[in-house]
Amino acid sequence: MTTTLFSSRIIQSALDFDVYKVNMMSAVAALYPDAMVSYKFIVRSEEDLSELLPEVKAEVLKLQDVRFTEDEIAYMKRVAPYLKPEFVEALRHFRFNPQSDVSFHNKTMSDGSSQLRITINGLWKETILYETIIMSIVSEVRSRQRWSDIPFEQFQTVLEDKVRYLKAELERRNITNFKFADMSTRRRFSFQAQRTMLEYLSKELPQCLTGTSNYHLARELDLTPIGTVAHEWFMGHQALVNVRDSQKIALQRWQKMFNGALGIALTDTIGIDAFLKDFDEELSHAYVGVRHDSGCPFTWGEKMIAHYESLGIDPMTKTLVFTDGLNFEQALDICEHFQGRVQVSFGIGTSLANDMGNYVNDQGEAYQPLSIVIKMVTCNGSPVAKISDEPEKAMCEDIFFLMNLKRRFEQPLDLNECRKLIDRLESEGQNYLIDA
């Protein structure tokens, strides 16, 4: 096993991204080949990343030389039979074009400080893979420039402590159904940290670790690639079909596209209450489960159980997947709460591949992982939004579109919440009006 937190490269191959990105790429290429989109990179942490711009840009531009190899294409055909063979074959011709697709600048904020800004524009099917790759690049460039003094042993010790805690708690609580997947690619400290973590967990917790969201590491370590769909699938539909029908149509077309093979529905693009209105009996039977990514997990889970029971569906035949910034302690509490009532599974990211414990550098600065996101902001020139079940996770640059979206889905319109969103957008140096 290596004893360093950094490898020679940041992005290892064309497969060094999250599984759900290529799933959505497949669906977009088949259903919306001409759709144009734009994404924005946002730093939520109170940390100036502007000085990282030259190295981040240089690393992103290296993507123009990345290709899907014959071995990688053969691997995807084997592990992802739900992807149409002609789509996988076409990946051999796929090329990243960051020179034209991705732009970088440092934006002056309202308080006079600077912040890194990245925008992505182009055909949806050609730009969809950038998100998790660019986030991985930003996170690792920051680690290399600012936290390269963290010793490997610090990360390893924190990881070993987590595993000891988990094993002890599973035995103490008599929990026998705890399953989780690694979902750390986007916010990993480094590629090597993610690899080290997966090597260790696959050895120490083979009965708990179900796989990883990273295709490259799944292939290298013989793990199951894990992933279904993300918010952008639902957000894009807001501009492609009648907005009130967008969530249901997105669910229906996803189900039809993959014949039920990727049947975990994401519930919080509009919010759980709006989701349940669209998640009718047919869809509830068709999807094998749902994913929680914001709001109180216990309240959400109780709502899902009640929904299934109201339709005469045994909740034990369905799976609730929890992925909202979890650590082992939080996941165990959720698992224990729902044990014997519904199947549960977890996706854990930052806590696994970007936790350095109580590390403090020589300047007295305590290490904290970055909070960064890349989200779709327009599709075919029209604004799109994520409302979320957690106001701080809401994403929209057009406050009027957001208000209309809430009205159409019969969601409460909280003016204080809108004001907070505008204040947050202003503090992040973003516009909050695309088109009036």
From Swiss-Prot:
Pathway(s): Cofactor biosynthesis; NAD(+) biosynthesis; nicotinate D-ribonucleotide from nicotinate: step 1/1
CDD domains: PncB_like
Sorted UniProt keywords: Ligase, Phosphoprotein, Pyridine nucleotide biosynthesis
NCBIfam families: NAPRTase (TIGR01514), PRK05321.1 (NF003704)
Natural source organism: Vibrio parahaemolyticus serotype O3:K6 (strain RIMD 2210633)
EC number of the protein: 6.3.4.21
UniProt function note: Catalyzes the synthesis of beta-nicotinate D-ribonucleotide from nicotinate and 5-phospho-D-ribose 1-phosphate at the expense of ATP.
Protein name: Nicotinate phosphoribosyltransferase
InterPro entries per UniProt: N/Namide_PRibTrfase (IPR041525), NAPRTase_N (IPR040727), Nic_PRibTrfase (IPR006406), Nic_PRibTrfase-Fam (IPR007229), Nicotinate_pribotase-like_C (IPR036068)
Any single biological process term in GO: NAD biosynthetic process via the salvage pathway
Family: Belongs to the NAPRTase family.
PANTHER family: NICOTINATE PHOSPHORIBOSYLTRANSFERASE
Gene Ontology CC entries for this record: cytosol
Residue numbers bearing the Phosphohistidine modification: 231
GO molecular function: nicotinate phosphoribosyltransferase activity
